[in-house]
Amino acid sequence: MAKTPVLIVGAGPTGLALALRLAHHKVAFRIIDRNGGPGQASRAMVVQARTLELYDQVGLADEVIAQGIIVDVAHVREGGREIASLEFRDLGAGLSPYPYPLCYAQDDHERFLAGKLAALGCAIEWNTALEDFSESGGKIHAKLATGESCEAEYLAGCDGARSRTREVLGLDFPGGTYAHSFYVADVKLAGDQRNDLIANLGDGGINLSLPVRRNGTTRLIGMVPDEMRERDDLAFADIAPHVRKFIGVEVEEVNWFSTYRVHHRVASRFRVGRAFLAGDAGHIHSPAGGQGMNTGIGDAVNLSWKLAEVLQGRVGESILDTYESERLPFARKLVASTDKAFSAMVDQGIAARLMRKWFIPRLAGLTRLPAVRRTLFRTISQLRIHYRVSELSEGEAGEVHGGDRLPWVAIGDGGNFASLRGLAWHVHVYGVAQARLSEAAAALALDVTVFEWSDAAEAAGIARDAAYLIRPDGHVGWGSARQDADSLVAYARRIGLRAA
C-alpha cells in the first residue's frame, strides 16, 4: 500500500496552490485528479492582490503578473451611456505592492501552477479519481478508482463543486441556484484590445466585458435573454445581436462559448477528523467581485502551513482545528455578500431595476473619494480578511490586531513582506528591539527582523517599537506594544508552538 503524509484530491487552482505550498514547506504529498489534464476552459479569471501577495511568498507573483493583464479602468454604463469610471491600475496604491486586480485565465493559470510543480519534481496523477476513504488508527485509508489503495496522514478535498470528498464525508452543502442562465464567451473584437473592464447595466441585468488573454481575447459575460433561457442548443450567433447592443462593437471571432447556471452553497463543515475541504468543494458562489478562485487559494494557504507545522513537529495537532474556525465563517460571509450583490445586478424586479438605474450610478460617483476607493480595494482584493476571533490571535499594537493581515509597508528592498518568503513564524519590530524580546524569540527559534521606524509604518497603523509575531501565511498571530517577552512565551506555549 502506498503511503503519503498528505493526499490532495483535485488539481484545480486550490489543489495546485496547496501542493505548491506544501512543496515549499518540504512536506511530501500525492496530488490526484479524475480528469485527464488541466482544464481547457476558463471560468475564473481575476487574481486579486491578496493572492498575488501569497504568491510572492513562494516566488510566483512576478511571473503571474507578466502573463496576466492589469485592468486599467473600470467603466460603468447604463443604456450605452457611461455613468462612472474608476482607475483600477493604482486603486490600492499604498495598501499593497499589487494595487490592482489582474486578469489571468484559469486554464492558463492552472497550466502555470502545474508547470511550477513539475519543476519541483512533483507529478500530478491525472486520470486518478478518489473512489472512497475512511479513517482509522490515526490514518486516512483511501481507495482510488485505479484499484490502488493509499494511506495518508491527512486528506485535502480540493475536488470542486461535485466533490467526492464531501460526499464520502456525508456533509450537507446547503444553498441554492439562481434562476437566470448566463453566457460566457471568449472573443476577438474589432479594433485594438483595451485593458478595461466594462459593466453595462440595464433592463437585461448586467453584462461584462474585460480582457482575458494577451493575444487580444476579450471575455464577455452576461445574462441569457429570457426568451432563450430554456434552449439547450444556444449558440453565440443567437445572442450576437444582444451582445452587439451592449458592447457597441462587432465580434470578429468567437473562440469559446458556453452557458451555465450560478450556484451559492457552503458546506456544513470544512474538517472531519483528518479530512479537509477547500475551494469549491467547500463553497461556491456567484462571480460577483471575482472572489471564488482567490478564496480557494486562500483556503489552500491557510491549510498548508498548519499541516506542515504539525507534520514537522513544530506545533500541536490542535492547530488544525483553526482551519475550519478561520475559513468557514469567511466563506459564509462571502457567499452571503456576493449573493446580495449578484441578486441586485441580475434580478428583474422593480426594486432591483431601480437600484441599477438610480442608486448604482450615484454610488459609483462616490469612488472619486480616496476613502471610498481604499475601502473598495480592501474589500475586493481580500486584504480585509482577518482572523481576530481565532484561537491563534492575541494582542494588538497600534491599529493592528492579532489575526489581521500584516499591513504592507514600503520600506527597504521589497518592503516588509520580503521577510515573509521564508514561510515561517517571524517576529517584526518597527523601531528598536529589546534584548529580552530577542532572547525569547531565539529560544523559540524565531527570526527577528527590525525595521527602521518610518512614516510609512505609522500610516499603515503599526505602532512604534511594537513587536508582532507573524504567521507563515502573513497574518499577525500576536502583537505587543511593549514587546512583552513573557507574553510572547506564554502565547507560544498556549498554541503549542515550540522550537523546531
Feature map (PLM): residue ranges:
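Glycine-rich FAD pyrophosphate-binding loop
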Residues: A23-R43
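FAD/FMN-dependent oxidoreductases across multiple families
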Residues: Q67, D233-Q291, T295, V315, ...
